[in-house]
Amino acid sequence: MNLKEKTRALFAEIFGYPATHTIQAPGRVNLIGEHTDYNDGFVLPCAIDYQTVISCAPRDDRTVRVIAADYDNQVDEFSLDAPIVTHDSQQWSNYVRGVVKHLQQRNNAFGGVDMVISGNVPQGAGLSSSASLEVAVGTVFQQLYHLPLDGAQIALNGQEAENQFVGCNCGIMDQLISALGKKDHALLIDCRTLGAKAVSMPKGVAVVIINSNFKRTLVGSEYNTRREQCETGARFFQQPALRDVSLEAFNAVASELDPVVAKRVRHVLSENARTVEAASALEKGDLQRMGQLMAESHASMRDDFEITVPQIDTLVDIVKATIGDQGGVRMTGGGFGGCVVALIPEDLVPAVQQAVAQQYEAKTGIKETFYVCKPSQGAGQC
């Protein structure tokens, strides 16, 4: 039974009438462009075929009833006429409540909804299960009540909910790719203008995500430190963001900067340039050049931004040794654990899976999780 069938069956069973709509919003993986989003730079993610699915129907009153199928059918119920506050014990509820609260501030021409939610985006793997949930909930209200909101507005609404209601800092990339993703394409996103250009993926290439299953511990504190270091760099150049600094300008005065800040700045500037070039390499089907850019990106994250860990570097080395120059691999996500992403010809996937299975656990003592994904469509009815 797929997620649509599961949520529709549960909806009818619990609410006693059939759902009118089923909405999905995908998770994502970022192919290249790491820690560039909050520097107003470029990212190149694609939506993946793991998603949050919501079966739903409008109500004729002002109540929102939500069932979380993946949390033992826990229930949340709240009114649109009372102030929406955080739920004491159910963290998942706060993503739903936050999205609805921020939607009210944008366009409150909507009424109550019944919904049943289920998803298969792996949690804690850095594949944006939370953004997928936020975009799915926003799309439910937009579709049921014909709200005049586009994908970018639904994405911004989800980001606001996560930053201000849930209380977790994030850039805009995760929500934007979930809302705007396009089947068989990646999206080159300008994080300053929110402009997005669809970039076709070469045929016969698999998007492979391998979770190191190394538990991230430093990610919050170190993430904030990196942001501060980038802001320090932008102030040094008297620019609003590192997006506005050229590599030439940086190289001319790099020695005057604090050495650690200089390394952080160099990563962001070089990563932005790599990301823009990667989009054109993908479009041309030049997997060899894409692989070189991904390798440079990983080295920059390891040596200049210092956000990789030995387990991740080991995974990258195993994959690279298997594929040679027929594709690319790098860490993806915030760092300090999490996943690597690889672009690999489909016929090489079994060899990569076998090499990782034979070597990774032997070298690290941890068993990996292996996902083979397809670049998928963004949020909408399913």
Curated annotation (Swiss-Prot):
Biological source species: Salmonella dublin (strain CT_02021853)
Protein residues bound to Mg(2+): 130, 162
Protein name, UniProt field: Galactokinase
Residues at which substrate binds: 34-37, 223
Record-stated family: Belongs to the GHMP kinase family. GalK subfamily.
One term of GO molecular function: magnesium ion binding
Xref: NCBIfam families: gal_kin, PRK05101.1
Locations listed in the record: Cytoplasm
Top-level taxon in the UniProt lineage: Bacteria
